[in-house]
Amino acid sequence: MSSSSSDENETTIHSSSNPGSSGIYSQLKAGSSKRPSVRHDVSDAEDDEEPYEGFRKDMNMEVDERITTLLSSLHFEHKRDVVTADEDDNKLRELHENIFSLITTEPDFHRRRRLKKALPASNCIREQVYYLRRKPITPPDSYYHRLNAALHTIVKESFGEEYRKVATVLGLVEALAEVLILEVHAFGIPETNAVEHRNIRKLIANALTNLTYGQILSKRRLCSYDGFIRCVVRIIIESPNITQVYAGLIRNLSWNADSGMSEALQPTVHALSLAAVYAHTHRFDVTAILSALWNLAGHSVENKRTICETPNCLKVLANILSPDARFTTLVDSASGILKYVSQYLATNSSHLELRSLLITRMLTLLKSSSFTCVTNTLGAIAHLIAKDPHMQQLIRQDAAAVQQLNVLRNSNREDIRKAVKEVLNTLNQPCSHRYGDMSHSVGGASGMLSEPQLQMQTSHHGYHGTASPRLLSLRATRASPGKYIHPSQQQHMQVPAPDQRSSSLPRHFAVQRNGFMMAQSFNQQMDPHQQQQQQQQQMIFQMQQQQMMIQTDDQQMRYLNQQQQQQQQQHYQQQIQRNQNVEPVLPVDDDLDIPTSTVMGTRSNSERSLGSMNPGSVMTTGGWNSTLDTAANSSRALSPVSFSDIPASPTMCAQVFNLPVHPEDNQMTTPPNHPSTQNTTHYSSGSANTMTRSDGTTVPIDNLITPTYATLNVTNNAARKTSEDLESPDDILPGPSLEVEEEGDYAIITGAEQKSDDDLLTRSIQEEMPTSSSTPKLKVSPRLNGFFSPSQKTTSSPAWSHPDTSPILKQTQRPKHHEMTTDSDRLLMESIMSEMPRSRVISPRLASGGQQYLDPEPDRSSHSKNEEADRRDAIIASHEPSDQGMNVGRGSSPQQQQLHRMESLESQASSEDSFGLNGYQEEHNTSSSAAHTMRIDKDDVVDASLPMDCVDDEDYDYTDDHFDDNYEEDYEDSNATQFDEGIDPQLTIDCSMISSGSGSSLQKAETTAGSRDSGALATSTPIGSVSSLPGVRRAKKVSINGKTRLPVPKTNGSLVDRVRKPVIEASRPRLPPKPSLLKGKQYHEEDLIENQTRDDTIYVNAPIVEAEQERIYMNALKHSQGSPSVNGTPPKSAIVSPYNYQKPPFTERSNGEINEKNVTPNPKQMLVTIV
């Protein structure tokens, strides 16, 4: 808008500086500027020679004037109803030829080129004007195409400033206005072909909006054009789909409008207000409409009245106000409208029901990020609260708004500081309370205050002024009901009850005398007769005050004597002996009801206090009925009386009643033979004792429950100590007795509770034990379950849950007296051992013997996550039942059984402390690893079944009916041999022969063929997942070359041998597959072993540790050489390696036993040989 104003000023200055120019289309020379150094994108070539500048200017003005003269002969406004003929069309073509000939005489090449470019579109618009004069019922298709093309060209080019000047010279503004008027007059708001007409009218509005931007003469000409504003109003009301573009046009026309333009645009205010109400849910429409209304609202009071009187318009504006930054443009327009509208609302009493809503919503805009929004909001608030005390009070009650106003006082913008100053001055004006007057309720007394009383009540000490915006304004300036009335009228008046409105006033806003609550300010002019009556009333009041003072002095002396007598007594009267039915003896307050300057200055002219002790005071008719002596005790039963009453801890603040007390304790104790009665308040629950040192009870106000301490009594056998002898406050406080079972603050420990505490302690110790892999608390992996305690057939459970092996007692286990020491020692030992950084395994030998301990294992320098997982699988495995259900094998020695069992475990990556052949080495080399391995007895039955990685326990059915009999059709091997008895359960899993990419061709072929025929890689699936297989097939074929291949399932499953096993629980956890790459090794002793064994190749997804493979192979070789098998079958062995292990390359050993072979590893498979 700023650019438009500058352009308007330039155009206006140029028009006034050339009085001899004709027409309203006199414009600046295209490309010229007041600043010669500034050049536009499309500018004329200016000659530096000064003699030619004046000549060119005169020539340009001569061309523009001649073109304007030719166009003025058309008289569109006067000949609008004249039906054109063919002769008129010929004259129009001759006119266009003359205009073209004038353009050719333009000396400026760039200007001449722009005029020629804009001429065809302007000629087309004029031709359509002549066509529409014929009032066609159904226009031809050429009408839409030609007019639509011309309008698109004009809208596209009208964004340039130079084109807008040239188009104005060629008369495009009048032509477009006439086309719009004739278009609406000829076709109206059609229902048929509405899209074409709507597009044409939308393009006309866009073209006029661009052409009038920054052109004040064009705006003035368009506003004064006959019938144009009426046509726009009709379109806004009847065509809501194109209201947005015409609202933008009105916005441009109303910006910086003069009086004539404002008067011409006044009919559009009502139409735009209605459109804002109808389209309030359409954001872009409302934004354009409110922008136009913002400009129009500042034109005249009539426009403001029209906006206010439009139904629901102010409600829509109030609902639009929001501090959300996304609607800043919309809120700026709405707040701008309200800034102007509030000026009209401040001068009349209309729309009172909407003012509070407007104020409330505008207060939320004080923190807006838009300076325009904040300025408009402050201006609207200042106008609305200028003469409205209710709105002022509404703002004072909003502490956040007052704080934000104080913040805006220091703004850097002058307009904001000025607006805030106006608002704060209105809020802080001393006379703002005058607008809150209330009429008299009773008595008919219009004013009876004397001048001294009027000065007293209006002084700074008499009332809290409203100068501070933080304080509430006074609710009334006249008494209701009247106070200073004639005594004859006073006797007929009813005394107001505490629940009346007068008693609801705050203390510092009311004055109470003679039983009536009265407001503190009184501003009313009194005639002499009223002043005389009030002086008489004042004299009567002074006499009453003197009598009250005499009575007050007598009551004060009696009260002081009573206090001295109580202090001289050795034993005080107990306050609890007063029953609720007995009226308390009320003391007298000596410093109240005395109208002195001190009281008026310190108590805000209010002679009523919360602690008034005068029985005949005005408190009997007021809202406060407290009789507590505030001068003597202002704590209101919230503080203890003596040092002994101060509790040592919150647990002492409990109810301790009916305990014997010492007769000489203090005034808080009850006599020994006197029944203890509680002094409870009427509104409390009745359980808390509220006795204090004061002589009167406290009547609660507004059902307020006062928190108090319980009465603390001392037992008879407790030694009484003074405050100087007290070592701690606990010495005189009652405590529970451990010998006598009674209710108190502490529990009494007996047999049953002690047992429960033992169980609780046990469980706490068990829960707090570390959860590392060395803790026996963890569960054993089901795959390792049964390797250590195959004799137990119970379900799988942690070692701590077994009653025979658990070192921690359960609730069902009751320890005997002679076993407590042993159990404690064992618990201590287990706790110490559990914190050791080693993995522990409980020996089954010691577990069966009744003693348990954890054997240490070799130290390690580092542990990986996979080592921790493998260690957890091996913890307390000896105490788990065996779910394999198989023995080691036939004809194998205990050492071989032990070897096979230890090799079946998941060993550690370092292979130094694995569960490999350490058990076997214990027999042959007792000095090397006897203390570092698990303790296994020779008579233990070792499970030598396949590792659980080869078995899918989820849904496997071990019945013969479950096996797939169609396996022979899927896979037929001509070189295979049928075994009716299945695979020999005596299995030896030997990893010495590795099938890899660079191995033997036979092994490679078998490896690839087995993997390809299976249809899927042999990847394991954890138990419980959706991809678990219902079962696997039984092995049918065995290859002739001596390598028996167990069939691989078609989908992700595990392998299992034919031997039937019991159904394994589905909830057994499985370790995720983490394959590692393997390397095959060639040993010199392979031929000897292959002659004695026939192995079978199985592909599983578990990785293998090559170092462990070599070590096991060497141990097995030594054992076979030392004690050859009778049947020619080597000992069983099973290796399951830990995850994430890759053996570093090694060189050829010196003894020539192992040679390095470069093989291509296959990370997907691990070769396991079975004999």
From Swiss-Prot:
InterPro entries: Apc_fam (IPR026818), ARM-like (IPR011989), ARM-type_fold (IPR016024). One of its GO terms (cellular component) is nucleus. GO terms for molecular function: beta-catenin binding; gamma-catenin binding; microtubule binding. Residues 1-481 are annotated as: Required for interaction with bar-1 and hmp-2. Keywords: Cell cycle, Cell division, Cell junction, Cytoplasm, Developmental protein, Nucleus, Protein transport, Transport, Wnt signaling pathway. Residues 857-874 have a biased composition (Basic and acidic residues). Disulfide bonds: none annotated. Residues 1-54, 587-617, 662-699, 720-741, 767-822, 837-936, 995-1030 are annotated as: Disordered. Residues 595-617, 666-697, 788-799, 890-913, 1002-1028 have a biased composition (Polar residues). Interacts (via N-terminus) with bar-1 and hmp-2; the interaction with hmp-2 is relatively weak. Interacts (via C-terminus) with pry-1 (via N-terminus). Probably associates with bar-1, gsk-3, pry-1 in a complex. Belongs to the adenomatous polyposis coli (APC) family. Has a role in endoderm cell specification and pharyngeal development. Required for the migration of epithelial cells, organization of the anterior seam cells and ceh-13 expression during embryo morphogenesis. Prevents hyperactivation of the Wnt signaling pathway during endoderm development, probably by preventing hmp-2 nuclear translocation. During larval development, apr-1 is required for expression of lin-39 in P3-8.p. Shown to negatively regulate Wnt signaling in vulval precursor cells. This is APC-related protein 1. It comes from Caenorhabditis briggsae. The gene is apr-1.
